[in-house]
């Protein structure tokens, strides 16, 4: 049986969007399992807060500002991880953006919000993978895990965000096929509703959608972090190009989620 406390000993890991929520939970889980983690986020104080909390636990973590929409910033983050840890073995793409929709009609969506959401949520993953791939291949145990959403699998509203998350599924499959010969595995985790800062002050909404989940609860960031850690580890050594849905059974039934929300304009992820 694998010792879960040491699955990533000696591994260098870079996590984007790690200043809060799912990204922070992923950084924490990898560090707890032995990884040396570069916590990156656009919000410098939040990234440093997460890294400092990990260091206080005796874990290895550094923080760096990274804007995944900027190639130079992404390149600098990858270089920092390699310089700090000696190798880059794990890349976890958590950074994303979801613009509020202008209205319930598809034709109301402005070009600007579409371009912004896709450039960060999909384009950002592309930039990070491009920068990291040579180092992941050199490590001999490289793994990429990106955070998708059930929005990319079924109709949960929010056109731009859903399109970007669906694109991640296709990117994951094509990149997995092209990276396998280099020894790099590429997978995707698709969460349902997870209790993050995006839902702060929206307890009524959470209560409304909770009953849509067969397992009877909303997901926690740690639920997603556990799935990411599995896919990034050697326990998943024969898994690549797949989407692991972590949604409390939502997509198995899809029981009226959109009608439970505000006009169906908000997705679960």
Predicted features along the sequence, with ranges:
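Short C-terminal tail/terminal secondary-structure segment
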Residues: 2-5, 103, 240-269
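Catalytic loop of short-chain dehydrogenase/reductase
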Residues: 97-98, 145-167, 172-181, 193
